[in-house]
């Protein structure tokens, strides 16, 4: 019997698989927002796709999602 790979639980909570790749939330939006401009805070809204260079690492961390 082959041993299953473990999923990195922290990564599984941070990334979701979509048809176009892996979806992630924007960083730098939790605290110390007073010194950031409204434009910058507005642009940090929503989700982005994981960069092509990082997709392989996310796949290794989350083999079953």
From Swiss-Prot:
GO BP terms, alphabetized: translation
GO cellular component, one term: cytosolic large ribosomal subunit
Gene3D superfamilies: 4.10.410.60
Record key words, sorted: Ribonucleoprotein, Ribosomal protein
Pfam (any one): Ribosomal_L35p
Domain of life: Bacteria
GO molecular function, one term: structural constituent of ribosome
Entry similarity comment: Belongs to the bacterial ribosomal protein bL35 family.
Protein name in UniProt: Large ribosomal subunit protein bL35
Source organism of the structure: Psychrobacter sp. (strain PRwf-1)
Origin organism lineage: Bacteria, Pseudomonadati, Pseudomonadota, Gammaproteobacteria, Moraxellales
